[in-house]
């Protein structure tokens, strides 16, 4: 088995999908896991990007089906901007499409800035822009878990195969969640699900960005990765890609294994 084939298997990627079937499977997963845990619903941060839009709509459909079947469940969508988000219009468009039971907005700037200032006072240096970006992601995680813990809700994560293969998420930030309904999907497959669900094109054709950096606001994921999502998707779907691209992907995959595992102990062998 080649490393490419091993990665596809490990990340549960299918070369070809049927969007309707995938939507059904993922809604059922959300419903089944919610019932198994006894939680009261879901909470998810909505950015206005493809991934949270898709996960949010699946979550809302899941809780609506549970209620129609005589159960009780709710979904809270959370806006988590740092000050004013330049693409707030996209976030509002996403919320209109998702139609969540409840929507709230938390400005994470006061918490992030207070921590950053205290860090500088105590340690005599400023956080790098990169590390401050990770603080933003982790404050967003803390906010979602505060809501979830208070109201008995599960935190949904938006990780998918193209992020998982590169480790392109913040450990214990956007990587911190209770369940991952987009697991196994490539970026283009996620777009196909949104198309099937009737999303506005603007939401799934939007340039993907983590938007965590103050010095490079709105920087494209592809710029930071040095790999395009089309290349990642081709690789993950078992297609041939240029050798240098395959090497970049595989290097990132191997280097980010710790992000896909629970914290290492001396009894584990995955890190050896």
From Swiss-Prot:
Reactions this protein catalyses: deamido-NAD(+) + NH4(+) + ATP = AMP + diphosphate + NAD(+) + H(+)
Top-level lineage group: Bacteria
Residue sites binding ATP per the record: 45-52, 158, 187, 209
Keywords: ATP-binding, Ligase, Magnesium, Metal-binding, NAD, Nucleotide-binding
GO molecular function term, any single one: NAD+ synthase activity
The enzyme's E.C. designation: 6.3.1.5
Pathway the protein takes part in: Cofactor biosynthesis; NAD(+) biosynthesis; NAD(+) from deamido-NAD(+) (ammonia route): step 1/1
TM region(s), chain numbering: none
List of residues binding deamido-NAD(+): 138, 171, 178, 258-259
Any one of the GO CC terms: cytoplasm
Protein family (similarity comment): Belongs to the NAD synthetase family.
Subunit organization: Homodimer.
The protein's name: NH(3)-dependent NAD(+) synthetase
């Amino acid at each position: 088995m080649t490393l490419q084939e091993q990665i596809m298997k490990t990340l549960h990627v299918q070369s070809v999908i049927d969007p309707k079937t995938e939507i059904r499977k993922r809604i059922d997963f959300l419903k089944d896991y919610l019932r198994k845990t006894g939680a009261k619903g879901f909470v998810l941060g909505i950015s206005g990007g493809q991934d949270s839009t898709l996960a949010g709509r699946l979550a809302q459909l899941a809780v609506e089906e549970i209620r129609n079947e005589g159960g009780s469940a709710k979904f809270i969508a959370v806006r988590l901007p740092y000050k004013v988000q330049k693409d707030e219009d996209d976030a509002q468009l996403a919320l209109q499409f998702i139609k969540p039971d409840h929507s709230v907005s938390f400005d994470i700037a006061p918490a992030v800035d207070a921590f950053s200032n205290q860090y500088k006072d105590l340690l005599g240096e400023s956080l790098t822009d990169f590390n401050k970006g990770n603080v933003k992601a982790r404050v967003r995680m803390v906010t979602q878990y505060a809501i979830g813990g208070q109201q008995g809700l599960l935190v949904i994560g938006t990780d998918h195969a193209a992020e998982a293969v590169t480790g392109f998420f913040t450990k214990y930030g956007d990587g911190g969640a209770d369940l991952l309904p987009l697991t196994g999907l490539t970026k283009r497959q996620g777009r196909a699900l949104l198309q099937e669900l009737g999303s506005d094109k603007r939401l799934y054709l939007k340039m993907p960005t983590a938007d965590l950096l103050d010095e490079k606001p709105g920087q494209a994921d592809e710029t930071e990765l040095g790999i395009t999502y089309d290349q990642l998707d081709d690789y993950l779907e078992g297609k041939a890609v240029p050798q240098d691209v395959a090497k970049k992907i595989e290097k990132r995959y191997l280097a980010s294994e710790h992000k896909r595992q629970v914290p290492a102990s001396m009894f584990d062998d995955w890190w050896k």
